[in-house]
Amino acid sequence: MLTTEKLVKLLKLELFTGEKGLHKPIKNTDISRPGLEMAGYFSHYAADRIQLLGTTELSFYNLLPDEERHGRMRKLCRPETPAIIVTRGLEPPQELIDAAQEMDTPLIVSKDATTSLMSRLTTFLEHELAKTTSLHGVLVDVYGVGVLITGDSGIGKSETALELVKRGHRLVADDNVEIREITKDELIGTPPKLIEHLLEIRGLGIINVMTLFGAGSILTQKQIRLNINLENWDKDKLYDRVGLNEETLQILDTEITKKTIPVRPGRNVAVIIEVAAMNYRLNIMGINTAEEFNQRLNEEILKKGHQSKEN
C-alpha cells in the first residue's frame, strides 16, 4: 500500500506539518489544483487526491477576506486527503498550517515548479499504483523489443534465453515475470528480487547471468511488446506459414502480439525469436512482408484471370 510517508521519502519531499497523517493511503493517480475550491466551490471537490497549491491558487487565496480564509482551508483538509503540497518554495498560509494540524493532513513544501512537480508525481503514482500480475515465462530484450517467452514447463524457455544472451541480447527475468500495467498498452516486466539475474538450466542448475556474461547481459525492467509461445510440434496442427494470422495475448487490460513457435529437434528457436523481434519492428514501422506477399499473390491471380478471359 502506498502511503504519504512513502511518497515523501521516495520523492525526497519536505514535510512541513501533519506528521500524524503520514499513514494515510494514496489510492488515486490523479492530482488536483483546487482553483475553484479556493473560490468556495466544493460541490465536486476530489478530496481523495493529492492537492497542489501553486502561485495562482495562493495569490487568489490572499485576496480573500480574513473571515473566509480559515473556513476555506478547513474545507480543503479532509480526513481522506492524503496530502497538500505547496510548490515553488512558497510559505504556507497560517490558516492552512492550522487546518492541516487540526485534521492531521500532511502539509508538504517543495521548491519545484508546480507543473514540474505535477509531472513527477503523476509518473510516480502511475508506477506505484499500477495494476500488477505475474506470469510463468522468460523475459528477454531482443534487438530492443521486450519478448516474453512462454510455454509448458520443460519446453526449453530458459535454454532459449541462454542462447539469446550468448548472442548478445539481455535477460530481464527467468521463470517468473512480474508485470505492471503503467498505462493502457504499456506493460513493464521486472524480475522478482530473489531470482534477479539468475537463470535455471535443467541438468546444470542455477547460473548468474551477470557474473558469467557481464553487466551488459541483463536489464532490470523492460516493456513487453511481443509474446513468443513455445509448444511441442503437433503434426496434426496447421501452423501459420505466411504470417497473416494475427494472434494476441491479453495481460491485464493490454493486448500484445503473440506468435506460436512449434519446437522440434533441428529448429534453432533462438534465431527464430531474433527474426520475430526484427519482423515485429518492421511491422510497427509499417512494413508487413506477409501482407505485401498476399497483395502480390492476389494481383497475380487477377492478372491470370484476365488473361484466361481474353483467351
Curated annotation (Swiss-Prot):
Enzyme class (EC, first level): transferase
Name of the molecule in the record: HPr kinase/phosphorylase
Cofactor: Mg(2+)
Superkingdom to which the source organism belongs: Bacteria
Gene from which this protein is expressed: hprK
Family, as annotated: Belongs to the HPrK/P family.
GO molecular function terms attached to this record: ATP binding; magnesium ion binding; phosphorelay sensor kinase activity; protein serine/threonine kinase activity; protein serine/threonine/tyrosine kinase activity
Note: Both phosphorylation and phosphorolysis are carried out by the same active site and suggest a common mechanism for both reactions.
Catalytic reaction(s) noted: [HPr protein]-L-serine + ATP = [HPr protein]-O-phospho-L-serine + ADP + H(+); [HPr protein]-O-phospho-L-serine + phosphate + H(+) = [HPr protein]-L-serine + diphosphate
Positions annotated as active site in the UniProt record: 136, 157, 175, 241
Record text on subunit structure and interactions: Homohexamer.
Protein's GO biological process: regulation of carbohydrate metabolic process
